[in-house]
């Protein structure tokens, strides 16, 4: 009987072992006991009593939202009222703060401002990139002492008669002019008394048909225009200096003739300047 009461599970608290006297030759193994009178339970006032009223206050009064998916356990989401939703008021423009007003009217203005900011930023970045690239390339260029000793070789067969061709030499424009016979005779016939900077034509050339000059005006350093001016030679558009076909100043504010660089002919059609 005791073993049955022990294995009764949840019914064990309400079961008890008793014995009764049965007439027989054997003496009872267990003395009969009188069940004790149960004491009245004492309630703990600090613990909440589980009643219908207390449980009804904890019950969910709103509809539940259940989510079920494949390979995931089912879950129930209760409604939360303590979540603060950001409104991004500080990041929005004044034209679109009013949710009841259409933002299409201010769309063009807002797009124009965005395009303007993008264009200005692009120009600034391009200018900064240009400076960086320029400095990087300049660092790989030849030094000043190397440029000072630089020479340039010119093929004279590429310059037709009566034409002037410009080159770059030591950072300056270099004019090479193939003169006609008429120009040679006219420049040789000029009297030195008519010149501001007297110099004979034959003193400025090694071959009469070739004139080699540095294309920098002796007034303020502008670059003259070839085959222009009152004397058919060179004309400075900055302040109106006129040079003849030999590079001598004839009219205007320039004080000196165009400079003749050092050069030598290494062949009939090849000249080396420098």
From Swiss-Prot:
Positions of transmembrane segments: 104-140
Sequence positions that bind [2Fe-2S] cluster: 217, 219, 236, 239, 241
InterPro entries membership: bc1_Rieske_TM_sf, Globular_prot_asu/bsu, Rieske_2Fe-2S, Rieske_2Fe-2S_sf, Rieske_Fe-S_prot, Rieske_Fe-S_prot_C, Rieske_TM, Ubiquinol_cyt_c_Rdtase_Fe-S-su
Domain of life assignment: Eukaryota
Residue stretches making up the Rieske domain: 187-272
Top EC class, one word: translocase
Protein name as it appears in the record: Cytochrome b-c1 complex subunit Rieske, mitochondrial
Species annotation: Chlorocebus aethiops (Green monkey)
Gene transcribed to yield this protein: UQCRFS1
């Amino acid at each position: 009987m005791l073993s049955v009461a022990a294995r009764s599970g949840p019914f064990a608290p309400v079961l008890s072992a008793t014995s009764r006297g049965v007439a027989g030759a054997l003496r009872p193994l267990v003395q009969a006991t009188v069940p004790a009178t149960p004491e009245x339970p004492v309630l703990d006032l600090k613990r909440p009593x589980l009643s219908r009223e207390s449980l009804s206050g904890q019950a969910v009064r709103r509809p539940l939202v259940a989510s079920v998916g494949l390979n995931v356990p089912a879950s129930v989401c209760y409604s939360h009222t303590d979540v603060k939703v950001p409104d991004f008021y500080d990041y929005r423009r004044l034209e679109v703060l009013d949710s009841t007003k259409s933002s299409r009217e201010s769309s063009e203005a807002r797009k124009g401002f965005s395009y303007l900011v993008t264009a200005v930023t692009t120009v600034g970045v391009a200018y900064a990139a240009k400076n960086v690239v320029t400095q990087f390339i300049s660092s790989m260029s030849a030094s000043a002492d190397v440029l000072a000793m630089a020479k340039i070789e010119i093929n004279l067969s590429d310059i037709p008669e009566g034409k002037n061709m410009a080159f770059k030499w030591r950072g300056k424009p270099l004019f090479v002019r193939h003169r006609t016979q008429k120009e040679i005779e006219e420049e040789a016939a000029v009297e030195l008394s008519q010149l501001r900077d007297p110099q004979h034509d034959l003193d400025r050339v090694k071959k009469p048909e070739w004139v080699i000059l540095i294309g920098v005006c002796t007034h303020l350093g502008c670059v003259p225009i070839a085959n222009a001016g009152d004397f058919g030679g060179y004309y400075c558009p900055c302040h109106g200096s006129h040079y003849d076909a030999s590079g001598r100043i004839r009219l205007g504010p320039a004080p000196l003739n165009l400079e003749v660089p050092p050069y030598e002919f290494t062949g009939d059609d090849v000249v080396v300047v420098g």
